Regions:
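Conserved C-terminal helix/tail region of periplasmic/extracytoplasmic solute-binding proteins
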Residues: 295-334
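Bacterial N-terminal signal peptides that target proteins for export
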Residues: 1-10
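Bacterial Sec-exported substrate-binding components of ABC uptake systems
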Residues: 22-28, 329-332
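Ligand-binding clefts/hinges and TM-proximal coupling segments of bilobed small-molecule sensing domains
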Residues: 139-154, 234-265, 307-313, 317-322
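Bacterial N-terminal signal peptides
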Residues: 9-20
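Short, glycine-/small- and polar/acidic-enriched structural segments
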Residues: 25-175, 179-185, 198-202, 207-208
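Pocket-lining segment of extracytoplasmic ligand-binding domains
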Residues: 88, 167-258
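Secondary-structure end/capping motifs
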Residues: 222-303
């Protein structure tokens, strides 16, 4: 009887140790951020630096991978648990056969500007002029197409010249070779310093578009839903922290951008404080817009459905449980 009692005590102790250690174990997670600029990557930096990943049981290793497409490719290859991505890259990865899904969002519109020569007086003046553009299927390409559509023009109304990435596009206009281009906040600032002007502020058009989002694999969702759930919660808290802790946010931006100019970071902070989505819910309408445009040059997109690219169960949970309302100290929405 004594032996039985002793065995029970030992079992209880061992069980307690196992349970206790399991609760303390953090899941090792590898996540790519795709820009070393002070934009949407800040949410990942913040979550790491202020301990939000750790709070939700994630032993996070952040990895810089230059570009959304490369991040998605690494995810599909099994090198990552999550990646930051632009919606277009997630769509392309899925259409190419990748078992991936968008699980949360940071920005649901296009934080782009159409900038050009001072001689361009209005958006209507873009008609017939030359534009420095990116290759089809990139976010910059979609931004150009949607900006034109938003002011009543089409891609056929301009002389599009494929130049490439942001520095090359800006240079083509600054040097006078082409008339206008599409740029993010940093490109806009550079262009304005060189004498270019903002012709269209796309954020003001509020065109739904899946810009920055967190993507994972279908396998991760099926086999480790709690890890995905924790990631989504951490990203939601990172957005809240960004919006409410300006000084900390800017200090972390300075760290990851290697001491970028404070004034420039202030401007970026103000812009993204408005752009970042509180409930981290992906924009289904934005994904639909992307598929409609992509269908013009990609037959696979014409047959695809929005639900093929997104899994909203985790962001739905945030809404239903009142997680977001609690963060922002407001009455629960239903």
């Amino acid at each position: 009887m004594r032996n039985s009692g002793l065995q029970l005590v030992i079992i209880a102790i061992v069980f307690g140790i196992v349970v206790g250690s399991t609760r303390g174990v953090e899941a090792k997670v590898y996540t790519a951020y795709i820009s070393d600029g002070p934009d949407t990557s800040i949410a990942y930096w913040l979550a790491k630096e202020v301990g939000l990943f750790k709070k939700h049981g994630l032993d996070m290793e952040l990895i810089f991978i230059d570009g959304s497409s490369r991040g998605v490719q690494s995810l599909i290859a099994g090198d990552l648990t999550f990646t930051d991505a632009v919606g277009t890259s997630a769509i392309n990865g899925r259409l190419a056969g990748g078992d991936i899904a968008i699980v949360s969002s940071l920005v649901n519109t296009l934080p782009y500007y159409i900038i050009g020569k001072s001689a361009i007086k209005s958006p209507e003046d873009l008609k017939g002029r030359s534009a420095a553009v990116h290759i089809p299927g990139t976010s910059a390409d979609f931004a150009m197409r949607l900006a034109l559509k938003g002011v009543g023009l089409s891609y056929k109304d301009i002389q599009a010249v494929t130049v490439g990435g942001a520095p090359a596009r800006n240079a083509a206009v600054i040097t006078g070779r082409l008339d206008f281009t599409v740029a993010t906040d940093s490109g806009k600032i550079e262009g304005e310093k060189a004498g270019l002007k903002v012709i269209i502020d796309m954020a003001k058009l509020k065109i739904p578009f899946q810009f920055s989002c967190t993507v994972t694999t279908g396998r991760m969702i099926r086999q480790n839903p709690d890890v995905v759930r924790s990631m989504v919660k951490a990203m939601a808290e990172a957005v809240h922290y960004y919006k409410t802790q300006k000084e900390d946010a800017i200090k972390i931006m300075q760290k990851y951008t290697r001491g970028q100019n404070r004034a420039a970071l202030e401007g970026t902070y103000v812009a993204y404080r408005e752009l970042l989505v509180e409930d981290v819910y992906p924009t289904l309408e934005g994904l639909k817009n992307t598929l409609e445009i992509q269908a013009s040059f990609d037959p696979k997109a014409a047959k695809a459905k929005v639900d093929d690219f997104v899994d909203v169960r985790f962001v739905d949970e945030l809404r239903k449980t009142g997680f977001i309302d609690l963060l922002y100290n407001r009455e629960r929405t239903r």
